[in-house]
């Protein structure tokens, strides 16, 4: 990895519906965080707004169309390609009855404690669990 690699911005949709959150699992052969759980997201294209990228990536990965809302958290991390900045945004499905494409599924928020997310997701998971316990 080049120490002068440009920063890559990642947009993530944290899709919430009826006490559940949309979660998938990365492929075992993924370059970064293989086999780890994840929220849908990916790279922000040049000139693209982070919120639009989160919605686009969510649909591309899970088949779920979402309305993207407030930013939950921004995390810094390093991927195999260099430094990344991850923008996590709260989102809601346009259709609450939609079935996501594998490997994504609806998971009760309290079950997030059983998941194995990359470290950059820890603050978002903590907040979701705290909000769930607060009612």
Feature annotation, model-predicted:
Residues 3-7, 33-36, 80-85:
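A generic structural micro-feature
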Residues 9-12, 38, 89:
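A broad helix-preferring feature
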Residues 120-135:
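Charged phosphate-binding loop/patch that engages nucleotide di/tri-phosphates or the phosphate backbone
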Residues 1-22, 43, 74:
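Conserved N-terminal beta-strand and adjoining loop/helix that marks the start
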Residues 109-123:
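C-terminal structural segments of small proteins and small subunits
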């Amino acid at each position: 990895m080049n120490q002068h690699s440009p920063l890559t911005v990642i947009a993530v949709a944290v899709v919430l519906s009826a006490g559940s959150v949309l979660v998938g699992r990365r492929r075992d052969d993924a370059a970064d965080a293989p086999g780890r759980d994840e929220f849908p997201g990916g790279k922000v294209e040049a000139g693209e707004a982070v919120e639009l990228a989160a919605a686009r990536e969510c649909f591309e990965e899970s088949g779920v169309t979402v309305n993207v809302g407030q930013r939950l958290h921004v995390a810094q991390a390093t991927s195999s390609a260099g430094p990344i900045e991850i923008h996590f945004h709260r989102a809601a499905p346009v259709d609450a009855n939609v079935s996501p494409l594998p490997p994504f599924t609806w998971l009760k928020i309290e079950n997030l404690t059983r998941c194995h997310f990359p470290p950059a997701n820890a603050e978002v998971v903590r907040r979701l669990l705290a909000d769930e316990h607060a009612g």
